[in-house]
Amino acid sequence: VKVDADTVLISEHLFDRIIDRFSSEPSLEVLSIGLHDFYTDTIINGLQISRNTVRWDFSKNSIFTDIPILDPKSYVFDTAVLSPAGEHSPNPSIPQAFHYGVHRGIKSIQKIHSTTHWANMQKVWHHFLQTRDVRLGFAVLGAELVYAGTFNRKDQDYTNPRMGEVLCTYKGMDAKQLEREIRRLRFLHWGFLPDDLRRRVLRYKRGKLDQNWDQT
């Protein structure tokens, strides 16, 4: 069972029910259980459980570290029975939210598996506009700085100080200031285009041309 550091489980019986699920379905190799996500306020693909026969390819320097080598027929994404298994990042700090945005921004411009992450960042943007929670604003700002070319895939590492240095330049911004800065960045970097066209332009420019794609 892979429980990320920013995930809080909410059921004391969850592990027993997971064991029962795998015992009753011998062909099941990977079970992913939906989590309630603070950023999007939706259920996201989150808690991943793998049978001990599952293998991963660690030879590639991939943004998507959780994708195993398996037959898709042996994979289940549960959004109804055991979901929500927990809360994803229920109370992030501003640096955590900013890092989330940068990381998801990089994921959303990849050659593959990018569409869902792009859609989720648009949900975070709308969630911010509804709630005015500055943590959501800083998450969107992080992604927009990826789209602006400020950050690349090397900058998302927690050991790289550059993300913190850039964040300091926005220190103390309130929701109104964040919205203004985000809208400015969006306009300057193809935000005037229809959403899906902007995604494809950024995927090509920031992803492929700026060499932020996974090397396959």
What are these language model-derived features?
Residues 1, 15-18, 31:
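Long alpha-helical, hydrophobic tracts
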Residues 9-11, 58-59:
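Activation segment
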Residues 59-75, 85:
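Donor nucleotide-sugar recognition loop
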Residues 81-216:
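C-terminal catalytic/acceptor-binding lobe
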